Amino acid sequence: MTDKRFSPDNTPPDASSPDSPIDTIAAAQPPVSPLTYADDMLNCQALKQQLELFQLWLGSEFRSGVSAEKLIDARTLFIDRLLQRLWYCHGFENIAQTALVAVGGYGRGELHPLSDIDVLVLSQTELSDEHSQRVGQFITLLWDLKLEVGHSVRTLEECLQEGRADISVATNLIESRMICGDVALFLTLQKHVFSDEFWPSPTFFPAKITEQQERHQRYHSTSYNLEPDIKSSPGGLRDIHTLLWVARRHFGATSLNEMVGFGFLTEAERKELNECQSFLWRIRFALHLILPRYDNRLLFDRQLNVAQLLQYQGEGNTPVERMMKDFYRMTRRVSELNQMLLQLFDEAILALDASEKPRPIDDEFQLRGNLVDLRDENLFIKKPEAIMRMFYLMVRNRDISGIYSTTLRQLRHARRHLASPLCTIPEARQLFMNILRHPYAVSRALLPMHRHSVLWAYMPLWGNIVGQMQFDLFHAYTVDEHTIRVLLKLESFADEDTRPQHPLCVELYPRLPQPELLLLAALFHDIAKGRGGDHSELGALDVLEFAALHGLNSREAQLVSWLVRCHLLMSVTAQRRDIQDPTVIQQFATEVQSETRLRYLVSLTVADICATNETLWNSWKQSLLRELYFATEKQLRRGMQNTPDLRERVRHHRLQALALLRMDNIDEEALHHIWSRCRADYFLRHSPNQIAWHARHLLEHDTNKPLVLISHQASRGGTEIFIWSPDRPYLFAAVAGELDRRNLSVHDAQIFTSRDGMAMDTFIVLEPDGSPLAQDRHEMIRHALEQALTQRHYQHPRVRRTSPKLRHFSVPTEVNFLPTHTDRRSYMELSALDQPGLLARIGEIFSDLNLSLHGARISTIGERVEDLFILADSDRRALKPELRLKLQERLTEALNPNDKVPLS
């Protein structure tokens, strides 16, 4: 931004200047310049009123369509003049060799509605006590006016000393701007700051690069987090500031326009950066207008208000998704320009030895250091397929770490002038498939192709998902960023270092006959999101067209299409179906058809879960997928029509458990008395180790009294809690409510009742971070559950407070009964808004309707829960249609997201 406020002596323009933003911006009631305030207006109450009027005017002007740039200029000028008026009011003009200096964002002239006002009180020598007291009164008044003022009081020598020691202080001084006071003193500061002794460019530049890298790492090196920081996330305003800081220090350029004059920015690049900055300023300005205090994070609860203020249209979450798509696309452009221009600066500032010549690779490319460079700068325009040749070169040559800046500039130019997508060129298609077949296809080629929008240039379908967000708590990244992370995760399965986290996938991945087909499926698995309809079905059709264009045979095309169509199948089956039911395994195996397809699918499933949200993957999900994988593998080897003999499994489990117990020299007569009370389902659905663990403690316990056991070792990835208690109505609700109150999430429940009315319930629980129950909480949880079990009358459990994030989402309650192979059980799927005490409320309704619960599988997907419940009526039969309808009505009424959840 060109700073029009600078006059030759670095003082602000006069209030009556025709260039003054306050005067030129049309408004019903433009604010009065603070320079015109009478002395009797210079009190806290009157000034506060003027500031409030000014903020209201900013909002009104913005809503009427005035640009953020003009309003930012207006606020900067307004604050300049207010500080000048107060400076003179406090008598500072009578104090020799002092100056008031704007630093930081205020120095750049970038005051958004809630921006900090950072000032430096500069003096030649240390201030006297009287003058220091006067400065204190000046700053205190600004604080009393509720201005976010950051200040420092330093002598000239202190500024230089602290600036040399701290890059942040140095940066503030580099972008400092005179407000009022001793001009000669300020110019002396400027002379020192821009001298070769004060942070010379070869030192300043690497320090700012390191600072940027550390900042990017704090945001997971992506601007695609769904709650980005407009200022600090990669591709945000700070990345533009970094370019300006470096240019200011090295070239003395004070604006993007001047960078063009120095030859380090083309006119097109300046225009693009200005466009990006203007967009980011507009969003940041709108965000500040809706917030009570300074913050630059686009949190979920703010996004809809900002989108509406910016006049994005559409139903439901559409305005948010449209705004965020624009945001992510802008930050992509900033990131690419930032990378390219900093590399150009690097070459200018830290110039390599001129005698070091580029090393030829072939007729078209050469190496400059470890960066690939064009030998003919017009190659990409003349032969667009050479773009793909460059990336194929990058995947094969491990010495290449990136693209040289001038080549990147040519790539950007050629990309914008393509007559048709790259995939229409036969040689480009062959090169793309060659890239996919390489072991490092993702990290060395597909990732940089995505960063530089070449994937988009290759296949236009990819462009549809670039920046495509989903307004929920489940997906942590945009669709394109998520897809790239899936691909990177798949590539990591070829690395032995990944084995501790993903032992099954690392074992299976090398056995895939054509890993490139898995990468292709991953590339397309979410390609149809945001287009309406079933994205899995649409994507499966898209990839068939792609496969035909790229010469895949029928078998290869059908496999990739099936993987895209069924990429959610294994995740849904493992987490939301009863995978201990042989019929479920048989149905899943029928869909999978072969062990080879099973290996492809489990690899894609694990990568998809991990890349959706880092918090989703835990040992519980890992155990479910392993269990489903091995059960399906066994079914496929046994043959589709052969089902396991359940009676034989019951007998086997009893014998194995007995063998374990005999090692403890137990009373077998007492044991058989306990086991005679248990139904066959109990032995079928517990492992021999679990059965032995229960029996060992029951033999030492009065079996007419409640017993609570908590496993010390993780079982199936979570902590197992076993409850033995006289069965009674609302027992499940009481236990679930107590576990929820203790901030434990239930992921699985197996509910059994013995022949003589004892509940034998098993719960798998996890801490909020997905880890098993902390050892130091075992005794407290056990005691709390025992108390809940011994209460004579059921009491509604006290409920935790709702997470602030959940308040901004609405999930309609949906109840669906699955087709079943038995008349003894009903399988009910429930989808609802996650909320404290949810499982207890569901349990209460089951008891109200006299239903018996036999099992539950609990999945929390962001703000949504998707649960499976296995139910029977009072006659131990499947629910009749009228009872299903009644249950559906009760659940929908009770779990309506508009209902208020009681607070503790």
UniProtKB/Swiss-Prot annotation:
Q: Which domain of life is it from?
A: Bacteria
Disordered as annotated region, ranges: 1-23
Inhibition and activation profile: Uridylyltransferase (UTase) activity is inhibited by glutamine, while glutamine activates uridylyl-removing (UR) activity.
Asked whether the keyword Nucleotidyltransferase is assigned, the reply is yes
Listed InterPro entries? ACT-like_dom_sf, ACT_dom, HD/PDEase_dom, HD_domain, NT_sf, PII_UdlTrfase/GS_AdlTrfase, Polymerase_NTP_transf_dom, UTase/UR
UniProt keyword terms in alphabetical order = Hydrolase, Magnesium, Multifunctional enzyme, Nitrogen fixation, Nucleotidyltransferase, Repeat, Transferase
Q: What would you give as a GO molecular function for this chain, any one?
A: [protein-PII] uridylyltransferase activity
Q: Pfam families from the xrefs?
A: ACT, GlnD_UR_UTase, HD, NTP_transf_2
Q: Domain notes, please? A: Has four distinct domains: an N-terminal nucleotidyltransferase (NT) domain responsible for UTase activity, a central HD domain that encodes UR activity, and two C-terminal ACT domains that seem to have a role in glutamine sensing.
Q: What does this protein do?
A: Modifies, by uridylylation and deuridylylation, the PII regulatory proteins (GlnB and homologs), in response to the nitrogen status of the cell that GlnD senses through the glutamine level. Under low glutamine levels, catalyzes the conversion of the PII proteins and UTP to PII-UMP and PPi, while under higher glutamine levels, GlnD hydrolyzes PII-UMP to PII and UMP (deuridylylation). Thus, controls uridylylation state and activity of the PII proteins, and plays an important role in the regulation of nitrogen fixation and metabolism.
Family, similarity comment: Belongs to the GlnD family.
> What protein name applies here?
Bifunctional uridylyltransferase/uridylyl-removing enzyme
Q: What is the species listed in this Swiss-Prot or TrEMBL entry? A: Pectobacterium atrosepticum (strain SCRI 1043 / ATCC BAA-672)
Q: What is the lineage of its organism?
A: Bacteria, Pseudomonadati, Pseudomonadota, Gammaproteobacteria, Enterobacterales
